[in-house]
């Protein structure tokens, strides 16, 4: 039997990128922004006057290297690899300076994944997997397999896709019905 494949986004799915951006912007501009303030919006729409600072933070060398891993992501992804071909599909073209940081981060926190399964791209319609777990509705819209939205503060009002709220939900979605 052929194994199904799952492509997984990195930012806001495997890694808490937004939390780190908010911390850095708050520190540099003394803002005090809380995650809850986004309420269905992107950070750049909540503080448009600081869009340049957000870009500066994202382009800072090392930014993507030190992100926190989302709770349970490592253990669930490892379990998924026992039954599925798992790929990491990250839109690194949005921040071209992020390539090496993202690669090193993936090697450190997901050492059980084959680096040949890391896909650094722009638009994820090039990824030919059975499933895509992503927080970005634009990427899910163009994906040709089954799109699964990973909940993030900016997408909470989007109901166009099947949704998982956490890595425990991902585990339940993909592994609960696997025959043992």
Swiss-Prot record:
Pfam families documented for this protein: NT5C (PF06941)
Keywords: Hydrolase, Magnesium, Metal-binding
GO MF entries: 5'-nucleotidase activity; metal ion binding
Family: Belongs to the 5'(3')-deoxyribonucleotidase family.
This enzyme's EC code(s): 3.1.3.-
Cofactor: Mg(2+)
Biological-process GO terms, alphabetical: pyrimidine deoxyribonucleotide catabolic process
Annotated residues for binding of Mg(2+): 9, 11, 135
Naturally occurring in which organism (per UniProt): Staphylococcus aureus (strain COL)
SUPFAM superfamilies: HAD-like (SSF56784)
Active site residues of this protein: 9 (nucleophile), 11 (proton donor)
The protein's role, per its UniProt record: Dephosphorylates the 5' and 2'(3')-phosphates of deoxyribonucleotides.
Catalytic class of the enzyme: hydrolase
Protein name in UniProt: Putative 5'(3')-deoxyribonucleotidase
């Amino acid at each position: 039997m052929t194994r199904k494949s799952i492509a997984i986004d990195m930012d806001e799915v495997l890694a808490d990128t937004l939390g780190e951006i908010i911390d850095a912007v708050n520190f540099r501009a003394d803002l005090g922004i809380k995650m809850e303030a986004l309420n269905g919006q992107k950070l750049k729409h909540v503080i448009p006057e600081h869009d340049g600072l957000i870009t500066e933070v994202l382009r800072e060398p090392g930014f993507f290297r030190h992100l926190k891993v989302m709770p349970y992501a490592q253990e669930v992804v490892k379990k998924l690899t026992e039954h599925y071909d798992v790929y990491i599909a990250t839109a690194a073209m949005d921040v071209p300076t992020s390539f090496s940081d993202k690669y090193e981060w993936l090697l450190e926190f997901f050492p059980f994944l084959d680096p040949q399964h890391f896909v650094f791209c722009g638009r994820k319609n090039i990824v030919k997997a059975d499933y895509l777990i992503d927080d970005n509705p634009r990427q899910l819209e163009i994906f040709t397999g089954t799109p699964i939205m990973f909940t993030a503060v900016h997408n909470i009002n989007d109901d166009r896709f099947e949704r998982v709220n956490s890595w425990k939900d991902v585990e339940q979605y993909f592994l609960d019905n696997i025959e043992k």
